[in-house]
């Protein structure tokens, strides 16, 4: 065990560690609060903005990141028809890319047959205020398309801030 002097010295270090943790947690909480303040106006305000450009997700890029391309686009709406190399349409524009659709595509064609998928993205949404349902995609909390009025900005801010707070513990 500790002697009296060693015990006294260790109590100082323990108290210092606890106060440092409290301060780091406060800083992480402050960051979360600022993120929420900035993004609170971003809401789901329309069903469709009419965007046809979307974001390109490639097989090569997904493999380099260590992710499956189909898993990356699950829960998103297609910005263009999904075609195989022969030109056969596997899924139509504005169709929700679901797990069932991914399974159907994988059963019907070789995975290497599809090199890229164009999806709708919040980054390309054409609305002047807010985000549309088709650019946002699935609400992962409820496993269904997002509803009008959902506070997408606050969800995003909390999704960034919460792990930061956890890392300080």
Residue ranges: model-predicted function:
Residues 1-169:
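Intrinsically disordered, low-complexity regulatory segments
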């Amino acid at each position: 065990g500790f002697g009296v002097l060693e015990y006294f010295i260790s109590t100082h270090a323990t108290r210092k560690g606890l106060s440092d943790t409290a301060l780091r947690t406060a800083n992480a909480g402050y960051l979360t609060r600022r993120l929420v303040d900035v993004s609170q106006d971003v809401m789901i305000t329309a069903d469709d903005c009419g965007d046809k450009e979307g974001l390109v997700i490639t097989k090569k890029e997904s493999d380099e990141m260590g992710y499956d391309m189909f898993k990356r686009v699950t829960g998103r709406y297609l910005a263009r028809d999904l075609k195989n190399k022969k030109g056969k349409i596997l899924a139509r524009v504005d169709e929700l890319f679901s797990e069932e659709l991914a399974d159907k595509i994988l059963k019907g064609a070789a995975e290497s047959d599809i090199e890229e998928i164009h999806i709708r993205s919040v980054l390309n949404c054409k609305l002047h205020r807010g985000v549309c349902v088709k650019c946002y995609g699935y609400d992962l909390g409820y496993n269904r398309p997002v509803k009008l009025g959902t506070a997408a900005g606050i969800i995003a801010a909390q999704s960034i801030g919460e792990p930061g707070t956890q890392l300080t513990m």
